[in-house]
């Protein structure tokens, strides 16, 4: 299956609630590559590459988030697959 790449910005109560770790663990379980980081505006940004079905499952999980979070919305951009990531990581 051909991989896809998405860049997502998550807004709401998503910092200080374990959202990056949740994003990371979910991506690892789905065998995706990419990264996640907090933004200064209080949002979380992430990029993921992998098979369409796994990326869609990951996005569905991000819409819910971990129990302490309150996701207000996701902005999702499709990007060109670059294949530059070896794993999924948390960036600081």
Curated annotation (Swiss-Prot):
It comes from the Bacteria. Residues 5-92 form the Acylphosphatase-like domain. Pfam families: Acylphosphatase. GO terms for molecular function: acylphosphatase activity. It catalyses: an acyl phosphate + H2O = a carboxylate + phosphate + H(+). Keywords: Hydrolase. The active site is at 20, 38. The keyword Hydrolase applies. InterPro entries: Acylphosphatase, Acylphosphatase-like_dom, Acylphosphatase-like_dom_sf, Acylphosphatase_CS. Its EC number is 3.6.1.7. Belongs to the acylphosphatase family. This is Acylphosphatase. The gene is acyP.
């Amino acid at each position: 299956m051909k991989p896809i790449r998405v860049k997502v910005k998550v807004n709401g109560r998503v910092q200080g609630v374990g959202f990056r770790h949740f994003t990371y663990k979910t991506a690892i379980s789905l065998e995706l590559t990419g990264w996640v980081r907090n933004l200064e505006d209080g949002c979380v940004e992430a990029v993921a590459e992998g098979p369409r079905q796994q990326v869609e499952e990951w996005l569905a999980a991000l819409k819910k988030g971990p129990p302490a979070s309150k996701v207000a919305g996701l902005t999702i951009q499709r990007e060109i697959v670059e294949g530059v990531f070896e794993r999924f990581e948390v960036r600081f």
